[in-house]
């Protein structure tokens, strides 16, 4: 009897079939790991998700804080020393990665009177949206473009560019670059110039005069994958959205909105980034919307709030905020307001992966 009881106790302690298969699987995983392989079935739900998963967080940077802190940097480092005196607007969901969204960098650059940010070029495309100041310039591909608040300036892939401030006041603008996309593909290149400034042979507004007037310089390319216009001035764009508003051309989600376009083909200004400018009447309450492009917004005028998945971000002039991809959001305007926005939508559309949700919620 004692022998039979001992036998039963031993059987009860013996590993069952499930334990055996788990042990066999673990041993298998350890063996294949030595050959730099791993099973897809253990991670499938993480790499092929039912809906977008993002680390990007809703966040707002108020201009009072931005300006105060950027101005402080002027006493600490020169534009020449820094090459570009910029404070990165870092998304708290991706701390330490120099990203505002997963695919876009954003920062605020300041250039003081008399300073020059030296000429260079890089594979990453860049845009500037002017926040504060008057009379500083960006020189791009030989054209010196003087800037004013609300101007939208583009610097395409590998275009030589430098900045200077010939005014008597500081100039601040928002920089947005696509280098997270470029670095994902591991295709970053950059080049410094021997001189601080590039030779400029084209007058301010030269590219706009040619390419946005219905005529082209003889011999100019008939198709470009980026806009040849350097500066989309606020003075030209603001009246257009004003006319749309007066005509009642108001989207229930986006207000009276225009898209900055390549005048050659009507496409986006850059292959990796697209921008819009929207006017909202006082009292506007937008319907909910979401899309797969994480978007950076700037308040050019007015006052209001954007609610993102139930979280309200209250904004005013020159405040910058981020709406993460595939998060429901809606705008409301306490007074007539203008919002500039930029995202990676053109890149997603080129890959056939951009999606929006405009249905009732």
Give short role names for the model-derived ranges.
Residues 2-101, 191-192, 198-272, 276:
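A short, N-terminal "cap"/entry segment at the start of jelly-roll beta-barrel domains
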Residues 8-62, 264-271, 275-278, 282, ...:
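C-terminal functional regions that serve as terminal interaction/effector modules
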Residues 86-88, 106-110, 127, 144-146, ...:
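Conserved hydrophobic/aromatic beta-strand scaffold that supports enzyme active sites
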Residues 94-105, 112-126, 142, 265-274, ...:
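A short beta-loop-beta micro-motif enriched in histidine and acidic residues
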Residues 109, 127-129, 154, 168-187, ...:
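A short hydrophobic beta-strand segment most commonly corresponding to one strand
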Residues 112-149, 155-159, 289-317:
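A short beta-strand-loop-beta hairpin characteristic of the jelly-roll/cupin
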Residues 140, 146-168, 173-178, 308, ...:
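Conserved metal-binding segment of the jelly-roll/cupin
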Residues 153-211:
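Contiguous mid-protein beta-loop-alpha structural module that forms a pocket-lining wall or clamp
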């Amino acid at each position: 009897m004692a022998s039979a009881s001992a036998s039963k106790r031993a059987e009860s302690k013996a590993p069952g079939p499930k334990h055996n298969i788990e042990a066999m699987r673990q041993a298998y995983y350890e063996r294949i790991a030595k050959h730099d392989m791993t099973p897809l079935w253990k991670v499938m739900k993480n790499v092929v998700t039912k809906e977008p998963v993002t680390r990007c967080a809703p966040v707002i940077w108020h201009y009072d804080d931005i300006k105060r802190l950027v101005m402080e940097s002027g006493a600490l480092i020169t534009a020449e020393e820094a090459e570009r005196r910029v404070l990165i607007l870092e998304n708290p969901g991706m701390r330490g990665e120099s990203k505002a969204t997963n695919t876009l960098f954003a920062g605020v650059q300041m250039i003081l009177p008399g300073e020059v940010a030296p000429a260079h070029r890089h594979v990453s495309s860049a845009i500037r949206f002017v926040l504060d100041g008057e009379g500083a310039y960006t020189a791009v591909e030989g054209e010196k473009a003087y800037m004013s608040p609300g101007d939208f300036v583009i610097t395409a892939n590998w275009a030589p560019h430098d900045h200077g401030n010939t005014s008597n006041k500081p100039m601040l603008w928002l920089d947005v670059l696509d280098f997270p996309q470029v670095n994902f593909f591991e295709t970053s290149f950059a080049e410094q110039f021997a001189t601080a400034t590039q030779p400029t042979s084209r007058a301010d507004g030269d590219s706009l005069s040619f390419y946005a007037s219905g005529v082209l310089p003889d011999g100019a390319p008939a198709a470009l994958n980026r806009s040849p216009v350097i500066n989309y001035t606020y003075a030209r764009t603001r009246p257009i959205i004003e006319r749309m508003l007066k005509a009642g051309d108001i989207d229930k989600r986006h207000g009276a909105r225009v898209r900055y376009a390549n005048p050659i083909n009507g496409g986006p200004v850059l292959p990796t980034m697209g921008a819009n400018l929207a006017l909202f009447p006082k009292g506007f309450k937008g319907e909910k919307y979401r899309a797969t492009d994480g978007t950076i917004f700037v308040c050019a005028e007015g006052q209001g709030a954007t609610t993102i998945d139930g979280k309200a971000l209250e904004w005013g002039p020159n405040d910058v905020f981020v709406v993460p991809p595939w998060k429901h959001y809606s705008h409301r305007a306490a007074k007539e307001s203008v919002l500039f926005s930029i995202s990676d939508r053109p890149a997603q559309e080129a890959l056939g992966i951009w999606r929006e949700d405009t249905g009732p919620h």
